[in-house]
Amino acid sequence: KFRKGLYPLRAVDKHDAEEALKTVSRWQDAFLQRYGSRIVYAADELYLKAGQPLPPPEAYENFPQLENGIGMMALFGQQFQQGLKGLGTGRQTSRRVSVATGTAACRFIESLVRTVEEKVPGLKVQVFPITNNFFGQTIDVAGLITGGDLMEQLQGKDLGARLIIPRS
């Protein structure tokens, strides 16, 4: 959308993502053997595009690329699970809430939501995947959702007691 007059790029597809992950894995193995650290990490989006599970949090070695979004989903998943442990048992509610996220992370967020719904009887969470109309539909990460897209796509929806939107 904003690339008029620039060198043409094409979106990464499933095959590209799989090949990139193989390359990153080979380099990680070599660096781990030689330097004791993986040094390079694949973007979360590559795992999603390839349909592969995210590496465990330990594979990100304290998340040195977190500011670039590398490992953000693995860390969020880990923190989410830790937060669930703090809930204890016996909680009940009749609350309905909504979560807005990018289309890339939608299934991941839905899996976390189902876990918390099982833990808290009566809680109903609706996940809204937000299509990025501002930057273009191939931009599918939560951190690049605009307020305009949120408002446009959630307007008129019954969001329940609270709407949770991505921080990054």
Name what the model sees in each region.
Residues 2-168:
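Auxiliary Fe-S-binding modules of radical SAM enzymes
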